Amino acid sequence: MKRKESYLSSDFRETVALRFPAQAKELNTAFDMRLSALLAENADASKEKQYHLKRQILPGIAAYETLQRVMPKEEALQTVHDYVERLARTSHKQLAALLHIPGLYRLVPGVFVKSTRSVFGPAAGFAPKELQTGNGVWRVDMMKCPYHDTCTEYGCQELCRCFCDSDDISYTGLHPKLIWERSMTLGRGNDRCDFCMKVR
């Protein structure tokens, strides 16, 4: 059975079909070959890290590199940013709608604690340093991140900012009584990502 495509792969195909129809076949082939090579080079990564690599990081790199064949680097970066931003805005809408359920917002910091430990932990290539994880506060410094590390490894560190921005779009202003804070990210050149989600 064919693996379901990442949203980044689908969005890339849509872009080339609409904007570069004459080269669409060639660009899709180039993208597929690059993505296959990236997946092969990272085949020994843990199952936990593969989740992030397959879903976002590697399709993002393949799309970014392939788009540069037909547009300037800055435009390619903005195009991939648009893909990530679109998903983040959808995610924000869904979460905000869910948080209309009375009192549910209080559970959000606790959910962030659990998801950090299960999906964004050392097994996936992250290095979270928990500063506060109780009383309606989730405060974590992320000292290492596979999004940043992989983008840097492939010479496209600037791409990581797309994923950093997606967090801010997804979690800012979810509910009047929830505060999302982050002043630093590895992808924006800082030495850590200082995450905080707390009940007001």
PLM regions: where:
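Secondary-structure boundary/capping signal
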Residues: 24, 75, 178-179
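Unusually extended, aromatic-enriched hydrophobic runs near protein termini
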Residues: 49, 98-125, 173-198
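Generic structural motif
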Residues: 3, 126-130, 180
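C-terminal non-catalytic interaction appendages of large macromolecular assemblies
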Residues: 136-141, 146-150, 154-200
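N-terminal, charged low-complexity regulatory/assembly segments
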Residues: 1-67
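Amphipathic interaction/junction segments at domain boundaries or subunit interfaces
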Residues: 55, 66-155, 159
